[in-house]
Amino acid sequence: MQTTPGKRQRRQRGSINPEDIISGAFELAQQVSIDNLSMPLLGKHLGVGVTSIYWYFRKKDDLLNAMTDRALSKYVFATPYIEAGDWRETLRNHARSMRKTFADNPVLCDLILIRAALSPKTARLGAQEMEKAIANLVTAGLSLEDAFDIYSAVSVHVRGSVVLDRLSRKSQSAGSGPSAIEHPVAIDPATTPLLAHATGRGHRIGAPDETNFEYGLECILDHAGRLIEQSSKAAGEVAVRRPTATADAPTPGARAKAVAR
């Protein structure tokens, strides 16, 4: 059921500014969703005429772009950093924190993950944050290509889990119900005994729940750990095979004998 936004006392003409409009848009979107947010509805929420909003934002997309920029700088860029010295735990915390941030705030999910329209400035900031994360993974022992792929895999895993959960909730609120594969009727012990046994023990197929998210995340971390171990082992073998400069260089006595000959 859609919440009816509360009506504020009407503001004086010229008393609104872009920051107030963006803040009000976030408040209203929390009540009615991004899809149902409209300029006239926002005007009523803020207590101003809709022309006051159009003075700063010509269309809804312009307002949503401004909301996205603020959301990224305020929420997403505040997630924990990845540290080279403790890469596994900090990367795990980074992924969990990112997922929780989006899962706890559907407006952020709709703006950043589903709509995914970033200004050039915000895109550059996002690239700089990814650069730091990948640099620390390289310092931890991954090659540049592996560090890029590992961070990309974690990012896709987080985003996929959050978006799938968000779309599922939207579908349920619209009355569509669970997906066909998750419906109890689809899993018959007589025809799909393995599925029935697994789901009977709490496992869910393709569900963006905690169990599936953690399993996927640990698989990525385990793979990264193996790559770092292989890289470290290969570097050690090269160091053992490489002769030292002192071992190759002739001693002063040997040089003297060679000259005498």
UniProtKB/Swiss-Prot annotation:
Residues 241-261 have a biased composition (Low complexity). This is HTH-type transcriptional repressor Rv1353c. Keywords: Cytoplasm, DNA-binding, Repressor, Transcription, Transcription regulation. Pfam families: TetR_C_1, TetR_N. PROSITE patterns: HTH_TETR_1, HTH_TETR_2. Signal peptide: none annotated. It comes from Mycobacterium tuberculosis (strain ATCC 25618 / H37Rv). Its main location: cytoplasm.
